[in-house]
Structures are given as structure tokens and as C-alpha cells.
């Protein structure tokens, strides 16, 4: 395959992947979460296309564990975002399907909010089936690829959600290509959690919703950078 990280697999390899994928625990603890995935070509311009592999896998992981109308859905970075249903029966088929999306665009976070709210209102979705967290996953920085994300835009979105009895989802912007291990998690003025890097511990911390200063500190202390000191 031209992307490299999901090359042609044997029947046995596909079966093993399907079994491994199906056995993954639910780190979301039954909370709905929706991935907004950067599918542009730059995600593949790294060794082993790791950012793309991580982003697409997270999109699939969160989508499969959602309940209600957001089950098996993700959103692609776009100026006109849409809820995209993930198709395919096996892990390999579903990952292949996600790889067919490759729009080169910033994401319009205001339009993402409107998309989710409109879907919820139209389908009478209860609060517990609304995504608690939106994961915006990219290889770029927040300010470089997110539009309509001012403090006033967030305040307006929060008000619109409240008018329909909903809470605005928490936003986690995840730069999966960043090598910044000094500040794996920060927050900007909009209250968006900015996550940098891609490690199993960071994944566990982010999906648990535990973005406390203590957890952030432990992520830094236990990073490879300080391994010799703590040994």
C-alpha cells in the first residue's frame, strides 16, 4: 500500500490484528468521545507515517465505542465538517476506509460544534450520548490549523448548547507529531487542552480525562528524557 503502515497483510495477520483490536479495553469508561482527524498528506510525511497511523486508529477507536447516533463516526478536518460513518467489517477494512479521506484543510471548530448540536437536536439525543470530549488530532499546532476558535466563538457555542439543555464538549487538541516532552499538556485561553506527543501513558492520561498538574508532572518525570536519572 502506498501509505506503508497498513501494507498488504496475509489472512492470518489480518485475523491476529482483528483479535488484538477487539480485545482492547474501553479506556473511555463508557463516555462518548469523537475524533476530528487531520487527514492531509502531511500526516504521512514522517517515519512509518506514525502520526497518520495514530490519528486514524484513534478515530476508529473512539468511534467504535460511542453509543447512539455518534457510534461508528468520526469527523475529518474540513472547513465544512461532516459526520462520517466508518464502514467495513474487519479492523483492516475499516482502517483502509478511513485512509480514503485526505482533504487538505484547516478545521472550522465552530462548524464542528454546530454539526454536533444540529445532529443532537434533530435526533433528540440525550446528554449522556453527546460526546463529552472532542479530540482534534493533527501534526500541527492549534493556531496553525484551527479556525473560528476565538474565546467569543467558544462562549457563543456554549450558549447555543445550553439553550438546548446540553453541555459543550471539552476540546482536546492532540499534536501526535510533536516531540515536545517538556510540556505534554497545557491549556490555552479558550480552555482547550493542548496535548503534545504520543506515548501509552499520555493516551491513558488523556482518555481518562485526568489532565491535572500532578499527572502532567508525572508524564514528564517518567519520560525517556529522565530515565537515567530515575533509574
Mark where each language-model region is:
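Acidic, glycine-rich A-domain
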Residues: 1-231
Amino acid at each position: 500500500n502506498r501509505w506503508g503502515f497498513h501494507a498488504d497483510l496475509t489472512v492470518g495477520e489480518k485475523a491476529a490484528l482483528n483479535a488484538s483490536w477487539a480485545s482492547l479495553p474501553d479506556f473511555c469508561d463508557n463516555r462518548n468521545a469523537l475524533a476530528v482527524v487531520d487527514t492531509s498528506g502531511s500526516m504521512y510525511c514522517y517515519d512509518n507515517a506514525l502520526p497518520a497511523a495514530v490519528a486514524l486508529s484513534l478515530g476508529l477507536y473512539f468511534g467504535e465505542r460511542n453509543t447512539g447516533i455518534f457510534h461508528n463516526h468520526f469527523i475529518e478536518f474540513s472547513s465544512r465538517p461532516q459526520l462520517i460513518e466508518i464502514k467495513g467489517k474487519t479492523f483492516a477494512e475499516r482502517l483502509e476506509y478511513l485512509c480514503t479521506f485526505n482533504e487538505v484543510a484547516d478545521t472550522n471548530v465552530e462548524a464542528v460544534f454546530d454539526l454536533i448540536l444540529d445532529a443532537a437536536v434533530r435526533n433528540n439525543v440525550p446528554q449522556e450520548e453527546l460526546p463529552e470530549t472532542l479530540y482534534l488530532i493533527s501534526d500541527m499546532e492549534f493556531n496553525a490549523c484551527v479556525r473560528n476558535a476565538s474565546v467569543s466563538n467558544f462562549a457563543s457555542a456554549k450558549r447555543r448548547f445550553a439553550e438546548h439543555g446540553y453541555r459543550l464538549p471539552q476540546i482536546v487538541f492532540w499534536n501526535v507529531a510533536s516531540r515536545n516532552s517538556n510540556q505534554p499538556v497545557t491549556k490555552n485561553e479558550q480552555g482547550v487542552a493542548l496535548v503534545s506527543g504520543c506515548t501509552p501513558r499520555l493516551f491513558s492520561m488523556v482518555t481518562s480525562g485526568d489532565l491535572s498538574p500532578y499527572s502532567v508532572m508525572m508524564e514528564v518525570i517518567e519520560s525517556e528524557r529522565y530515565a537515567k536519572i530515575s533509574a
